[in-house]
C-alpha cells in the first residue's frame, strides 16, 4: 500500500509536454477545442504577497487563462543589470499560475503601453542621441536583443511544450497605433522569439490591434503571428468581422475586453456598469470567441511608474492608482462586477471554490507632522554633485531614472521665462521663493515675466 501511494504521488507531480494550436474556428489545447476566458493580472502592479490570493479569486470567477505584460524597465532598471526577484519574480508568478491550473498569455513587448512609465521601456534608452524606439534602428534593437535574449530563456521552462502553461506570446503591442509601421522591426522581434522559445508550432504568436483597417494593416505580421483585436462592451460582431478580413481562418479573439477604464489626473474616477459587460461577454461566448478581460485586477502604479496617454501636444497622465473599475479592486477586493461576471460564467460551467477573503481595512488615526525642511535647507546634505553647463541637461543624460532635478542659474536682470516643451512638470522659484508651475498638459502657463533686477532661478 505504501509503495502504491508513492507511485501515485510521483505520477501526480510530473508535468507533461503539450501543445496549443489554431484550428478552423477555435484554439486546440492538446488537440481538443478550448474557449479562453482570460484575466489580465499584471504581476508588477500587485504586491507579490497577494499573487496567490489573486489567482484563487480569478479561478473562482471562472477564468481559465491569465494574461500579463512584462515590464522591461522593472527587470533592467540600468543597462545590463537584470532583476528577476521579489516583485519581479516571473518564475514564481508563472509557477503559481500553473499551480491553480491556468493557461498563460504573455505580452513581453518590448513596448507594452499599459499606461505604465514609458510603455515599459527603460529610461536609459534615451541616453542615446537620435534613438528611434519601436523601429529596427540598431540603437534600439541592440538593447532589445540583449533584453529578449535574457527574458525569453526565463519563460522557456514555462512554455506549454516544455510542461508549462504559456500558450501565447504577443509580438510588440498594438503596433498599428504607432506611426512607424516598420514590418522589418516586427519580423526581428518574431525571430528573437522563436530563436529563444522554438518554432511557433506548439504555441501561438500573435498581435493585438484596434479593430480598424489602418491599425490591423500596420500592426499585423502576416504568416507569422495571429492577428487579434481589442474592444470594450458593445456589438462584438463588427470588430470580429474586421478581424476576419485579415484572419480568414481561426478563432475570434478579443485580446483586451474592457470591463472598466483608466483614469487621468484632474478627471473623475471611471465607472462601467456590469450589464453591458455581461451582454457582450455572452455574445462572445455564443460566438465561441475568446476574450481577455483587460484588466481583471488593475493594482497600483508604484513610485514614479504611472504612465500617460496622449500624442503631440496632448498629455493625460495617469494617477498612482490603476484601479480601472476592474472586477477586482486595486486592493484585490471582489466587487459587485466580479460577482456578476462569476455568476454568469457559472451558468456555463462548474467553478472552483477556493477559500479567499477580501483585504483587511484599518484606520491608523491621525498622524501629526511636527517638523519640516525645505528643499533649500537640505541641498548641502544631498548626495549629488552639481553639473555645470550652458544649457539644461536632460534627466537621462544625468543618469537619473525618476524623481526630480534642480536646475539653477543666475540672471543679471529680470526677464521673461519661456518654456516650450517640458516633460513633465516644473516648479519655478525666483530667489528661493515659489513663482509658479509649468505642466506639460497646460503649456499656456509656461511664460512669466520677472522685474527683479537680479534673480536666481
Map each language-model feature to its residues.
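N-terminal carbohydrate-binding accessory modules
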Residues: 2-9, 13-65, 95, 101
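Aromatic-lined substrate-binding rim segments of carbohydrate-active enzymes
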Residues: 51-119, 123-125, 190-198, 203
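Aromatic- and acidic-residue-enriched segments that line the glycan-binding/catalytic groove
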Residues: 80-88, 98-99, 109-135, 186-190, ...
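An active-site-proximal structural segment forming one wall of the substrate-binding cleft
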Residues: 86-106, 128-166
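Catalytic-core region of carbohydrate-active enzymes that cleave or remodel glycosidic bonds
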Residues: 95-98, 102, 195-196, 230-329, ...
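Active-site neighborhood of glycoside hydrolase catalytic domains
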Residues: 139-224
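Beta-strand-rich ligand-recognition modules
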Residues: 320, 429-457
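Aromatic-lined ligand-binding clefts that engage carbohydrates, nucleic acids, or primary amines
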Residues: 415-432, 457
